[in-house]
Amino acid sequence: MALRNIRKYGDSVLRKKCREVEKIDERLVTLIKDMLETMYDADGVGLAAPQVGILKRLFIVDIGDGPLVFINPEILDTDGKQVDEEGCLSLPGKTEPVMRPNYVKARALNEKGEEFEIEAEELLARAILHEYDHLNGTLFIDRTTKK
């Protein structure tokens, strides 16, 4: 495993839409392991592939209950509203209030290629939606409620 360089705000890769992962192979598994190591080293709760310069539809989250890997994720449903401060490893030191759904239902593949669905609320829902945004070139500062 290796630490990857986290791309910072201003890097054009953070504004690009990611492509679907076509196959789960040894290179992708290595990328996932590297992303986990990088996220934990930076004290993050999530990291998306474009944040390490890879334009693939892949992100990881861990809010303290163990890591979750999302490959080619889809958002199936959202509900409710919550406003809370968000930060991002690509914008170190910056936080802003962001309104997000309080509930999300998502479908993705895990690192073994197995499809799963997850229902999440509060912090986990926020983390999933934040990382999902990265796959479409959206940053949390685009969604801030601060004027």
UniProtKB/Swiss-Prot annotation:
Names of the cofactor(s): Fe(2+)
InterPro entries, A to Z: Peptide_deformylase, Peptide_deformylase_sf
Cofactor note: Binds 1 Fe(2+) ion.
Recorded superkingdom: Bacteria
Pfam families xref list: Pep_deformylase
Biological-process GO terms, alphabetical: co-translational protein modification; translation
UniProt-listed Enzyme Commission number(s): 3.5.1.88
Enzyme class label: hydrolase
Reactions this protein catalyses: N-terminal N-formyl-L-methionyl-[peptide] + H2O = N-terminal L-methionyl-[peptide] + formate
MF terms (GO), sorted A to Z: metal ion binding; peptide deformylase activity
Keyword line: Hydrolase, Iron, Metal-binding, Protein biosynthesis
Active site: 131
Binding sites annotated in the UniProt record for Fe cation: 88, 130, 134
Family to which this protein belongs: Belongs to the polypeptide deformylase family.
Purpose: Removes the formyl group from the N-terminal Met of newly synthesized proteins. Requires at least a dipeptide for an efficient rate of reaction. N-terminal L-methionine is a prerequisite for activity but the enzyme has broad specificity at other positions.
PANTHER family hit by this protein: PEPTIDE DEFORMYLASE
Protein name in the entry: Peptide deformylase
Record organism: Clostridium botulinum (strain Alaska E43 / Type E3)
Lineage: Bacteria, Bacillati, Bacillota, Clostridia, Eubacteriales
Gene: def
